[in-house]
């Protein structure tokens, strides 16, 4: 255990924080342009074709972003908004596309958790 004199001479080092979403800087979301839209397969033991896109952000960085929900309208050169949030079974995917913002349409015929998928309230 350290003494008071030792702490006065040499203070304890502060722990450095490492961001999980470095491309966003300190921003909650960032705008970008789709460079490539494609599907990829997840790690074992899962099996699917996950929809992802390569995005060039306004700060010049290029990241891979996941497109959540059933179906999407994204093509190359589409302007999209991305947020942080990794996909556990896709290595290297640390960002999500915000559905219902800019060129990305919301999920059609979504009834529950609509706000997460950019779906308007259905006409009753």
From Swiss-Prot:
Keyword Protease: no
UniProt keyword list: Methylation, Ribonucleoprotein, Ribosomal protein, RNA-binding, rRNA-binding, tRNA-binding
One MF term in the entry's GO annotations: tRNA binding
Xref: Pfam families: Ribosom_S12_S23
GO cellular component, one term: small ribosomal subunit
Statement: the UniProt record of this protein carries the keyword tRNA-binding: yes
SUPFAM superfamilies: Nucleic acid-binding proteins
3-methylthioaspartic acid PTM positions: 89
Matches recorded under InterPro entries: NA-bd_OB-fold, Ribosomal_uS12, Ribosomal_uS12_bac
Gene Ontology biological-process entries: translation
NCBIfam families the UniProt entry points to: rpsL_bact (TIGR00981)
Family statement: Belongs to the universal ribosomal protein uS12 family.
Quaternary structure annotation from Swiss-Prot or TrEMBL: Part of the 30S ribosomal subunit. Contacts proteins S8 and S17. May interact with IF1 in the 30S initiation complex.
Purpose of the protein: With S4 and S5 plays an important role in translational accuracy.
Protein name: Small ribosomal subunit protein uS12
Organism: Blochmanniella pennsylvanica (strain BPEN)
